Amino acid sequence: MDGIVLTLWLVRLLFLALLYVFLFAVVRVLLRDLRVASRGPAELGRLVVVASPRGEPLPGAFFQLDAVTTIGRDVNNSIVVDDPFASADHAVLTFRGRAWYVEDLASTNGTFLNAIAVEGIAEVGFGDELQVGEVRLRLDRGRS
Amino acid sequence: MSIAAQARPFASAGTRIRPRIRTTETALLALVAVTLLVGAASLGATQRLIEAGKAGESLASLDFGAPDPVALVVYLGTIGLVHVAFILAGRRIDQVLLPAVALLGGIGLLLMQRLPQDLVEQEFAGLVLGLGQLQAMWLLIAIAVIGALALGVRSDAWLRNYKYTWAAAGIGLLLLTFVFGSEVNGARLTLSIGPISGQPSELLKVILVVFLAGYLSENRSLLAEESTRLGPLRLPPIPYLAPMGVMWAIALGIVVVQRDLGAALLFFAVFLAMLYVATGRLSYVVGGLILFIAGAFVLYHLFGHVQQRVDNWLDPWADPSGAGFQVVQALYALGRGGLLGMGLGAGLPTIGGRLPVPAVHTDYPLAALGEELGLIGLLAILGLYLVVVERGLRIAAAAHDDFRSILAAGLALVMGIQAFIIAAGNLKLIPLTGITLPLISYGGSSLLANAIVVGLLLALSDRGAGAPAPPRRRRGPIARLRRARA
């Protein structure tokens, strides 16, 4: 009888121990995941080309963004938009602190954020759409 | 700036599905299966030993068979099937959530098999199912829902674009419960339509999170603005404060009409947490808490049932065999459990054929688990909820737009906060009327709602199908021949 009780006691403790083995294994996975996520300079964001009637930039392409990204028809811009409705220096995207902002550089036809004209400077959330000329671009969070 | 090199159309990826091995998930699920089988063995052996003790026999050897091996094996098998489906679909879905959820569900299943089976009985076509079998059935449906949502939800547009429709549906559901709900134990929670009865507040919490995620991601920048000044307070534009007021009113309405303190607390806490996630402003949380405390104070003085709950909580020993019975018995159960617990199946002595803790299978599972697994076991279970919340917040951090991010954070927090509230209530930290412990408590509505939460989280964690592996160079005689010919 005592042997039975002892075995049972050990099985009970084994169950509790296994719960902690599982937690330990999970925590190891989580730590590894966090370490990978914190390694290296993360992307600040990316611009995905949603629509581009003239094919420059290519629809479906994306651009990894630096903290200051200029958009326009001039070839010296970070993102060149070859569109007759875009100005040479059309707009600039800046990352300040925790959020992205777009500024219209007095372009002829304006810059639109979610179909609303940008006056001065406006905050851009991830998932928002920018329109420069006839080209529509969506801001996405960068991959880690 | 590295541009054109990475520029490639999205369409090229994932035209062909390739299975993708998920080593972490496989290993963790194997561990879950072993843990649950050991738990079932411990439970079965303890029950046999107690039966033998009652009959005055002494056992020569102990049979470590599980009490209901079929249900457990079918449960583990279903989870295995979902796992295989994830592998075959080749997506990069989170690998930790499913094992954690499977372990929580399995512990719930063991607990339901251990409690007296006649606590809940339902008859299907002449077949009488007890508590354990019903729970197993609901768990199978829940696992299927998790798998279906994780693989089936490829686009979030149906959640994002119809947020006001969802909100309307939610409020409709709430009103239906207010009007047609039936009262059980002094709380009007259950809605019966024909043969189906359920607790809409469980589903409501998911709808609430979806609506808030849509609303907050759309109006984020406006809410973070400070344009209205009210004395020393700086507030966002008045129209955007309206949802806050509406939420507050809904929470109070639930307390008054439904007499459901737990759900009201859950909804309001989730609302404040999501508001903080979206705007990052602590002043909203402080303002919301002040509103909540003011509301709670007024309700306490106006309504008898609130007063009674609070009195039970402050001093359950004033009436230990009446109003305070449940709280007192739960505390005794936790005390009996101690550090290591009495062992699965060895706790909860019945008093005159009745269980010591009323509603132990729905509102007080933590009291039973605390008695049988002890402090060590309870901490492990709370740790599992923490794992679920951590995964949810990581999914939120990695999501690539605001809606998905806020939605994932909200879904993870709704489960975490619910577990926290019910744990606090069971341990007599806060006054409570019952809500369920996610994934462990008995009940179809609760399991299904939480399955939807987990399924959506898994779908949100999906980083798309992996790029197809590069074509492998064929080795062997035929390939060599071909190369020679070329």
List each language-model region with its residue ranges:
Chain B
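Membrane-interface capping segments at transmembrane-helix boundaries
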Residues: 9, 46-50, 219-222, 460-471
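Long extracytoplasmic/lumenal interhelical loops at the membrane interface
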Residues: 340-376
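Cytosolic juxtamembrane amphipathic/interface segments immediately preceding
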Residues: 10-21, 58-59, 83, 125-126, ...
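Long, low-complexity, intrinsically disordered cytosolic termini of multi-pass membrane proteins
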Residues: 1-15, 468-486
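Hydrophobic alpha-helical transmembrane segments of multi-pass inner membrane proteins, especially
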Residues: 65-326, 367-425, 452-456, 471-486
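Transmembrane alpha-helices of multi-pass inner-membrane enzymes
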Residues: 428-466
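N-terminal membrane topogenic signal
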Residues: 13-34, 93
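Alpha-helical transmembrane segments of multi-pass membrane proteins
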Residues: 34-49
